[in-house]
Amino acid sequence: PQARWIRAIAMARVSSSQIVVQARTWLGTRYHHQGRLKKSAAGPGGVDCIGLIVGVADELGLQDGAGNPLSRADETDYSMYPERGRLVGCIEKYLRPIPLDKMSEGDVLLFRTFKDPQHVALLSIYPTGGLGLIHCNSSAGRVVEQPLSDTWRRMLTHAYRFKNKQLQSLK
C-alpha cells in the first residue's frame, strides 16, 4: 500500500507543450527505418517517424492504461510500405482519435503518403507562427520541424491525442 501511495505522489502531469519541447530535442537525429536511437554527443542516432513518437513518449515516462511504459508496446517488424490497417490499428490501441478540426499542439497526426496511411508526426506551434510538424522525414534524412503546409494537410487522414491516463508520468 505504501509503495502505491509513493508512486501516486511521484506522478506528474505532462502537458502538450512538454511533448513538443521534448520532441524538439530529437531535431537533427538521422533517419533510420525502425530506428529508436536519439542523436547524442556519441553519434547521430537513427530513428523513423514512429520511433520518434515512441522515443518522446518514453523520455516523458508516458504509460499505457496498466501503468506500463508506452514503449513496451513498440513494434519494429513493420515494412517501409503500408500494411493495410496495421498502423491505424496499433495507434488506436493506445491513443484517442480526435476530429481533425480539434487537433492541437502535441497531438499525433497520421498521413497518407501513398495508398494507405503510413507516416506520423507531432503537431507543433511553428516557431515563426502557425501550425507545424515535428517528424522524421525520410526525404530530409533526419528529424525536422516544418510548417503544416497545404500539401501535408491534403495527406492528413487522422489525428490522435494521448489519453489523460497516459499523460501521468513517473519521471
Task: Label each region the model flagged.
Residues 118, 138-164:
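Short, Lys/Arg-rich amphipathic alpha-helical interaction segments
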Residues 105, 129, 155:
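Residues that flank catalytic or metal-binding motifs in active/ligand-binding sites
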Residues 122-145:
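Catalytic Cys-His active-site segments of thiol-dependent hydrolases/isopeptidases
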Residues 9-96, 100, 105, 112-114, ...:
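N-terminal capping segments
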Residues 78, 109, 152-156:
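Bulky hydrophobic/aromatic packing residues
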